[in-house]
Regions:
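Two-component/phosphorelay signaling modules centered on CheY-like receiver
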Residues: 14-33
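Acidic catalytic/metal-coordinating carboxylates
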Residues: 37-40, 63-66
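Receiver (REC) domain active-site loop signature in two-component systems and cognate sites
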Residues: 59
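Short, conserved "switch-loop" micro-motifs in signal-transduction and mechanochemical regulators
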Residues: 86-87
């Protein structure tokens, strides 16, 4: 039997974290943790060692691209999928250039989220 992939959700908006958690748990992923800011995200990544991180691009304080860089300093093989609102193409490109596997646009379409994460985990 295949084990569930372990996911860390990072978003400053509790509602967005709840939406992603709901999509993932309904599709056989295990949400091992959540973080509401960049410092918490880096600490939880190091503590939990998830298979993949969903990471909001725009957060107060440390933005998602900076968090991505810090996570990849700790683990160059880390799998990270960025979450972005429309109009953030420049930041998405920067994130991909810094090692993000893919991105998902807000508002989320559940099937697109699942497909993107499964592809990033291959």
């Amino acid at each position: 039997m295949r084990t569930k992939k372990r996911i860390l959700i990072v978003d400053d908006a509790a509602f967005m974290r709840m939406m992603i958690r709901d999509i993932l748990t309904k599709n056989n992923f295990e949400v091992v943790g959540e973080a509401a800011n960049g410092d918490e995200a880096v600490a939880k990544f190091n503590e939990l060692k998830p298979d993949l991180v969903t990471l909001d691009i725009t957060m107060p304080g440390m933005d998602g691209v900076t968090v991505l860089k810090k996570i990849r300093e700790q683990d160059p093989a880390a799998r990270v999928v960025m979450c972005s609102a429309m109009g953030q193409q420049a930041m998405v490109v920067e994130a991909i250039q810094n090692g993000a596997r893919d991105f998902i646009n807000k508002p989320f379409h559940p099937q697109k989220v699942v497909e993107t994460l499964r592809r990033a985990l291959q």
